[in-house]
Structure formats: C-alpha cells, structure tokens
Amino acid sequence: MICEEAYHQQPQIQKEQMMTMDQRNNHQRKRSPLSSPSSPSSPSSPSSPKSPSFNNNEEERLEVVNLSGMALESLPNPSLNLAQICKLDLSNNHLQTIPESLTARLLNLIALDVHSNQIKALPNSIGCLSKLKTLNVSGNFLVSFPKSIQHCRSLEELNANFNKLIRLPDSIGFELTNLRKLSINSNKLISLPISITHLTSLRVLDARLNCLMILPDDLENLINLEILNVSQNFQYLSALPSSIGLLMNLIELDVSYNKITVLPESIGCMRRLRKLSVEGNPLVSPPIEVMEQNLQVVREYLTQKMNGGSPRSPSKKKSWGFGKLVKYGTFNGGSRSWNREEREGFIMPEYRSIDSLASPRYSGMFSPRRLFSPRTYFSR
C-alpha cells in the first residue's frame, strides 16, 4: 500500500520528534512553521473549527495551514499531527517536490493548494487523500498525473491550468465520479481520455488553450455539464462530434478560435443553451448570414437541416467577418448580462493575448500562473 510505504520512509528520529511534538500538543499548542496561527484559547476562531469525534472518541481540532508566498524550497518539519490538517496552502513558493511521506499522513485533508510552484510530478501517495475535495496544482511543470490520483474519489474540483500536461490518466473518468469542475486549460493535451465521458457529476469542463485535435464521441453521457470551453485550440481542432448536441443541460458552449468549418446539426436540439461562441473559425455551415443573427435563428437553421428540410437563410446583412476568419458568433440567448464570476473565469470574446505580459516592462509585476490561478479555495 502506497500510504503505508510512504509512512515508513520517515527516518526514525523524525518519528520520535513527531511523537514528542504530539505529546506537547496535548498540554499546549505551540506556534511553528507548519501550525495554524490561531490560539487554542479561542475555539470559536474561524481558522480552528471543531471537528466531529474520530474513531478514538476524542475531539481533535482541524487546522488550516497557510504557507503561501514564503519562498519555500522545501517543507519544514511539522509540529502538529498531520492528520489534524484539513486545508493546506503551499502556493506561490519554490517547491519542486511534495514528499511522499507528507501526503500519506494528511488523512483528513479536504483542500490542497500548491499552485505557482515548480513541481514536476505529484507523489504517488496523493491517492491516500481519500477525503480531498479541492486540488489546485495550476502553474507548475506537470507533464502527467500519477495513476493513483484516481483514488481521490471525493475530489470535486481539479485545477491543473498552466502546466505541461500531454495526457490525462486513461481511467480518470471511471473513478472520479464526484468531480464537478475540471480545469485543464493552457497545457499541451492532444486528446481527452474516453473515460472522461463517465464524469456524470461534471458541470464545468475548461480545456481551452491546448492542442486538442478531437473530442470524445460519447459526450452525451456528461448529463450535468453546463459549461464547456474548448476554445483556442487553433489549427488543431477542426470538427465537433455530433454527440455535443445531446448535452441537454449545457448553458454555455465556447468553441471559438479553432479550425471548425461545420457546426453539428444536433446543436439545434440544445434548448438550454444560452451562450454560443464560435468566432475565429472558418465556418461554412451555417452560412454567414445565419451566424450574424441571434442564437435562436442559428438553432432553427440547424434543426431544419437536421430534419431534412431546406432551411432558408435570412436576408444578408452587413458582415462582421474578415475573409474566412469569422468574427461574429457569440450569441446570448437572453437579455441577461453575464458577469465575470458567472463565466467561471473563462476567456470570452474580450480575449486579449498574454504575450505582452512577458515584456521587460511587466517583468516581476505579473505572472500568468498567478493571474489565472486565483486563491479562492480556502475561504471558510
């Protein structure tokens, strides 16, 4: 078992040190680099909630540990029982690895944030985090996930934006059935595993800014999906599967800045769809005079075509397109305005290139990893 092996990798002297520290904590809690700054004399403090009793029928205090932005290159020895930590923030440091022995002992961890570090691989013992609900590993150098991540069956949000991922585990969708939000934008993914269509709890899938060449065929199995963003795969993504129109709960679909020439006729069946973004594609069907109209007109055109009819195009109006690269195509299904929070942080039509942020003028002021990896997971 990975968890047991990782635990026994600890040097004996460190185990004795941990036992001594835990005994001290029975009498008084001491501040340390890995302890919460809250005082034991204030049990109502928001950083020290009481937890339900554990198997030993003793109430223990669950801790929120924040070591963000401390320029850490390695982790200090903990001075409290690691099983007491429920939220751990190690973001914005210089960490290159996460010790196997650390994750193996974080038995009650529900949120782990290591974004904006230099981590190249996650430990295999990540699979020991059976209670983990939120994992933010964005802004690192990950090429792949360990297969053991499939054992994090409580996981609800996974943020792996701004890495170097070239693939996801083949079985990731078979095990992470509680996953509600998957953010994997700004990587090097060529395809998504077929098992991803088994994520029946998934509500948000953000796979923009990759190298996706194809999407899985059985997308209709994502019965709760509300937001799908596969934009800005540029010359790689040239077609959408017809099953995309069977996503009956989809509200927002962004396929902008790809190489798509034909929209599937099944999109006409998407009655809950309120926003469709297709700008930056060399679309041929529907024709430009249809795409210049509202979403309802586009839906009716595709429905008529699917039913074998001969859809009539609206009278041609002034084009917003430039050559074959169409700039039209973001349709709102209603008059309601969508604020940035409701868009889940996606890059919408007001997209601007982040290349300019690399200029000397902005050196040290902005980091794309930090800009697109907001620390929102540790609000209580």
Swiss-Prot record:
Widely expressed. The keyword Transferase does not apply. Residues 9-23 have a biased composition (Polar residues). This is Plant intracellular Ras-group-related LRR protein 6. Leucine-rich repeat protein that likely mediates protein interactions, possibly in the context of signal transduction. Belongs to the SHOC2 family. Residues 1-57 are annotated as: Disordered. It holds the Pfam family LRR_8. Keywords: Leucine-rich repeat, Repeat. A motif (GVYW) lies at residues 298-301. Residues 33-56 have a biased composition (Low complexity). The gene is PIRL6. LRR repeats lie at residues 59-82, 83-105, 107-129, 130-152, 154-176, 177-199, 201-222, 223-247, 248-271, 273-293.
